[in-house]
């Protein structure tokens, strides 16, 4: 009996698993209400640096005269905090004097104009991408004096705050306690009942720091806004906490977000807001002499939010002169079609010329008002 040879079995091969292709979607990054594009390469023409000192601001108790608001006090030491009735420096006031209140300092920078800034598709704007800031301070020893052989020093509540943005800083109006109302002169106090403003709610007022009249005890930065802004603040409490201030010119603060985009100067302006308190001594608030800023700008391309039609209407199609003209004018519609003319204007045209040889636009003069021939020519 012969054996049939076994057929070789085919080796089963599993199909190779194909790596799924990841579909890349177009990323659209918006900031400040515009679509942000690539940055312009750095060069001498596309980079800009500015340095400035911002002075501290203390309120002014002078009332408004002739409709003019009082100017702020650029002091580093406030007036003495005391009670108006007893003169004691212990009782806390519900309406303190304005010259004992620290307000936000405000500065505005206008970068230079960019040549060939706008094209049909995009436009170039200045972008703040890094900065350096520090306080101008000195130790206070002999300047504070001594009592009973003990040298005084600064202590108490401290505040360190700065903000840079393409628009003024957005703030919310709050009160430290349910009885605090703020100064009666100079400062802009949050409208509303202090009993409801000492805790955030849906009726909390909002504003923008457009002047140096906003107190640091009544207005706080709004974390739900300030999209095109970067701010930093630190509050140190305690009745006897001494200030610890570090300063130097070897630290750089990057201002780029998670998409690598800095502060866009879409309106051609950069707004700087700051407020600092070192503590109190002899019932007076002490602040630094100034805060120093060194700002570095570069150019960034953004998508042009204006179409040519909008630019034409806003720039070219705007009357240069304002006139007081008649409003009851009768409008007459003329059509450029060959047809019989009304009898009232037949005598004004030459009879020896063919109507087809006339120009497309003809000025007709008549002793009587012209009639609308649009419906008759159809």
From Swiss-Prot:
Gene3D superfamilies reported in the protein's UniProt record: Capsid protein VP1,Polyomavirus
InterPro entries on file: Capsid_VP1_Polyomavir, dsDNA_vir_gr_I_capsid, Polyomavir_VP1_sf
A Pfam family per the record: Polyoma_coat
Gene Ontology cellular component terms for the protein in this record: host cell nucleus; T=7 icosahedral viral capsid
GO MF: structural molecule activity
Record-annotated membrane-spanning stretches: none
Disordered: region residues: 1-21
Full protein name: Major capsid protein VP1
Organism (species): KI polyomavirus (isolate Stockholm 350) (KIPyV)
